[in-house]
Amino acid sequence: MKKNSLRRLIALVVLALAGTPAFAAPALISNPNVAAEKIDAATLKAVFLGKKVAWDGAGRVTLAVLKGGPVAEEFLKGTVDMSASAFGNHWRRLAMTGGGTAPKSFEKDEDLRKFVAETPGAIGFVDSALADASVAVLTPAP
C-alpha cells in the first residue's frame, strides 16, 4: 500500500513539474527602423518610464508591454526596478495627469512581437525564444 502511495506521489510531482511553463530570458526588441543595436540602461529606463518620447532620428517612441507573467516581471524588475503592477500604476498616474499615454499592452508575446514589427518606432520585450528576424533585438548596455 505504501509503495503505491509513493508511486502516485512521484507521478503527481512529475506531472506538476511537466506542466510548469518554462521561459527564456526576456529579449528587448524594436521595430527595425529604430537605429540602435545597443541602448544604455539610463535611456532604456527613460523610455519605459515615459521620459524619453522620441528616438534620435527615428520618430516617436511607441511602447509595447506584456500585461504580466514571468517575462514581464523579470524585464521590468531589471529595467525600471518595478513589479508589473507598480509599472502599471506608474503609467495610470501619468495618463491621469496628462503626462503620457499608457503603453500598448498585450497578453501574448506573439501579439506584442507582431505589433512591434509592424509599428515604426515601437519597442518592447518578449520571451527571447520568440524574437525573430521580423524585429531588431537590442542589447542593453550597462
Region roles according to the model:
Residues 18-25:
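Sec/Tat signal peptide C-region and signal peptidase I cleavage site
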Residues 2-11:
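Bacterial N-terminal signal peptides that target proteins for export
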Residues 25-142:
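Exported/periplasmic ABC-transporter solute-binding proteins
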